[in-house]
Every structure is written in structure tokens, then in C-alpha cells.
Amino acid sequence: MMIKKVERFFKSDAAGGIVLIAAAALAMLLANLNATQELYTGFLSTPVELKFGALEIKKNMLLWVNDALMAVFFLLVGLEVKRELVQGSLASRRQASLPVIAALGGMVLPAALYLAFNFQDPITRAGWAIPAATDIAFALGILALLGSRVPPALKVFLMALAIIDDLGAIVIIALFYTSSLSMVSLMVAAGAIAVLAVLNLCNVRRVGVYILVGVVLWTAVLKSGVHATLAGVIIGFFVPLKAQKGHSPAGTLEHALHPWVGFLILPLFAFANAGVSLDGVTLAGLASLLPLGIIAGLFIGKPLGISLFCALAVKLKWATLPPGVSQKTILAVGVLCGIGFTMSIFIASLAFGDVDAALVTWAKLGILVGSLLAAVIGYALLRSHLSRAP
């Protein structure tokens, strides 16, 4: 009886989101209990080294999760978005343009709101990109809690929006927060992308070949100084989708990756990244301009930017809403996109890490509060609206 209940749980649409939230809650608990704090941080700091001839990759456990395992998640997202671009709800130009326009609004307005609070301070002004990011893993995890009530087109819209948002964040990091890029590694990455394109054009249908070239691409992107998860999206876009003799390489790979991503990779990601220590944090500090600017950017700027840009695009006939999706739903999804979390924390560490550790702490507090508000209110709005939908 118990086994059947467990099986039913893992087959439910909301299971992945529940496991993700549980892993995040456990991480917060371990990171803030005196008895487990050192054990938790020690585990994430454990160095793991990979050597292959002259190639050497040495990262701690946290970075292996974020750079390697999350590339697999982005591979799955790339496969799903490609399918929708070719066959599904993003197949027309006007439908595909909506998440691009939404992502632009979701980056511009949060950054502007942050600067409204912090423009006068040349030090905190450098953190303008912190609220421009969206944590796609947590946003999709919260959406998964709503199960089958979520229209497929809405999930695809959120995935596409978040991918473009992430690409924008990667470009921002490369242009404004990275001191040097390895041109040799970027050239190797470009060569790997060219090989993937040739494989696709020649209709090579063995998934293993794409994965092999993808490993080279991931390594090159990692060594270049650009966020390595970008490689996953690129690989996903080149794996052939068209079915022949009832077999679609992209479809088969997508089906195989789903349980691993939902019940292993994303919970590990949540466990590794959600453990933000609250040592030294006071509620009084929340009134300072740095965290206030981040909270305003994530919780107010994100939904306003996304919904306003979408409404304008639809009014000007530049884009159309996905089937079964209304402007109210777009606003609710915009709130959910205010979950900046890991990408926002990463940008905060780049902006303030070499300046003042206290600024990083206050930025993390703002990110945590803003992301939590976005998650709770976004979930409540979507649940309410989707429950009333016909």
C-alpha cells in the first residue's frame, strides 16, 4: 500500500516541485543550525578534480552542481523549447517573439528600479544587474506545484522567457562583471558548435555523438569564463527533432532526462544553493537602500516589466498571447520570474565580492526576501487564476 502511494506521488505532476522545495528548506535549515552549519558548508566546499591528459578542471562541489549538473537541466530545457518552436505553441513568429519581448521588459525595469534606490552610491550602483536575473529552476519548480492545472503553453512561455533572461544575464556578466575571457576557449567552443551544426545538417541521429561533442563544448565554455550552463541549451537545439521510423532523437533524450532532472539534479541544485546563512542579518538592515532596491526590482520590477512589455507587444501586433494564456496569467508568471535567487546571488558576489563582504550579505538578504515574496505571491496568483479558468 505504501509503495503504491509513493509511486503515485512520483508520477504526479507536482512531485518534482515538492521535492525541490523540500531540498531548499533542508538546505536553509542546515545552513543556519550551529550543529550542522560547518558540515553543510564543508560539504559544498569539498574540492573535486578532473584530469584528462593536459586538461584539468578543479572545482568545489557547489560549482560542479551549478556548472555541470545544471548544464544537463539546460539541455532538457533546450530540447523542450526547440520542440515548441518547431511543432508547438511557439511555432509562429508572433508567438515566439513574445517571450523575447517579455524577457527584455523583465530585465530593463528591475534594473531601473534598483538604480532608483542606489544611483547616488557609486559602490552599490554596480549591483544594477542583480534583480535582472531569473532563477529558471526555482521558477519552474514552483510552477510544477500546480500540476496539471498549468496550460502547457504557459510552461513553455516561462521556460523560453527564463532562458532568454538567463542568456541576457550571461551577456551582462561577460560584458560588465568578467575581467577577462579566454579567446582560445571561445574559439574551441565555436568550433564545437560548428560540428554540432554539421551533425544536424547531415541528419546524424545518434544522440551519443551530440553528447560527446557537447562535452567538448561544455569544457570550452567553462574554461572561457562564460557561464557553462549555456552549453546545455546549445546542445539541445542541435539534437534532431524530426521523427524517422517512429524515432525522434530529441524526443527520446527528453523523455530519458525528465526523471533524472526532476528528482535528482534540481533537488541537488536546490540543496546546494538555498542554504543562505542568516548570521549577522537583522531586520533593521532590510531598510537600507541596497536590499530595498533588490526587493523592489525582483518583486515589483519583474512582473511590471514583463506584463507591460507583453501588453504593448500584443497591442502593437508584434506578438500574440499563447493559447489558453491571458494578460492576468502573464502578470502572475511575471511575479514568479522575480525569483532571482542563485543567478542574482552570483551577480551580487561578482559586483561586491572584492569590495565589501557585508554588501554581499545584505544583497543576499534582499535577494532572499524578494525571491521568497515572488515565489509565494506568484504561486498564490497562479493557483487562484488557474482554478477559476474554464
Curated annotation (Swiss-Prot):
This is Na(+)/H(+) antiporter NhaA. It holds the Pfam family Na_H_antiport_1. The keyword Signal does not apply. GO terms for cellular component: plasma membrane. Disulfide bonds: none annotated. Coiled coil: none annotated. Belongs to the NhaA Na(+)/H(+) (TC 2.A.33) antiporter family. GO terms for biological process: regulation of pH. Its main location: membrane. It is a multi-pass membrane protein. InterPro entries: Na/H_antiporter_dom_sf (IPR023171), NhaA (IPR004670). The gene is nhaA. Keywords: Antiport, Cell inner membrane, Cell membrane, Ion transport, Membrane, Sodium, Sodium transport, Transmembrane, Transmembrane helix, Transport. It is found in: Cell inner membrane. It comes from the Bacteria. The chain crosses the membrane at residues 14-34, 61-81, 97-117, 126-146, 156-176, 181-201, 221-241, 256-276, 280-300, 305-325, 330-350, 362-382. Na(+)/H(+) antiporter that extrudes sodium in exchange for external protons. GO terms for molecular function: sodium:proton antiporter activity.
